Amino acid sequence: MFTYLAHASPLHRLNPAMKLAAIAVVALAATAAFDPFIPAMLLIALWLTAWRLGRVPFLQMLRWSIPLALLPLPIALFNALYTDLSRYAHPHILWHWGIWTLSTEGLWNGLGMGLRVAVFVAASLLFIATTDPTDFALSLVQNLKIPPRFGYGVLVSYRFLPLLKREYETIRLAHRVRGVGEGQGLRGWIEKTRRYAIPLLAAAVRKSERTALAMDAKAFGALPQRTYYRQMVIRRGDVLFLLAWLLYVAAVYALALHFGLAHLQWVPG
């Protein structure tokens, strides 16, 4: 799910640093909003951006939408059941049993919290799916002036999970060849975790050591100036993309405030 989709699209051609700035604008906008309206509008815009500008296939978008809808459900339900109703003069109680109380206000808050989580996941997914890891590292170093050691460290981290996934598959196939079965139920899951944890940890440590030695051998950060084969430049389209998101977020906030739908964390209740 969280993998780079390598194909040509306007979103793929954007400068990663400016794309990251736009994603940061979306994340900050969602962080400040505790109502469902603002996160829902941001989520719709992210979905359309991935589909039209990122040219992500529609079926792929649907596959992404299923976990994107299921992941926030427990968070939304928890917040709906445990909303502090003392803040409301006349809360609308829908259901009550023991310590659990479900109200209209609680559902509104829970839905807002769940949609906020969905926005964070969708924004991260959009960035990862449309950003080449190498371009991202180069952009961090060249455009954002991050030290090369940290910039390429981000690149290594970016590619670390796929490496661990392949290592996991190798270990699983090796166990199958040796006739080691996978037990069922909780006991089987614990046993499988024990068998896989140590080899995966050893592989992670080994790869980290090799990466650190390779970075030291290339003298990252030792010289004041570095030359690059590929230059990452910020074009007009990159700036327009960031401005478009800023204007959209401002418009959504203006609508929410105008119609009394906004519940912002910096505004006293």
List the predicted regions and their residue ranges.
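Membrane-helix interfacial "entry" motifs
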Residues: 8, 12, 56-60, 97, ...
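Transmembrane helix-loop junctions and nearby membrane-interface residues
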Residues: 58, 80-87, 249, 253-260
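Membrane-helix interface segments
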Residues: 36-37, 57-58, 145-148
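Juxtamembrane/interface alpha-helical elements of multi-pass membrane proteins
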Residues: 64-179, 183-186
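Short, aromatic-rich membrane-interface segments at the entry and exit
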Residues: 35-43, 60-63
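Hydrophobic transmembrane alpha-helix segments characteristic of membrane transport
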Residues: 42-49, 135-140
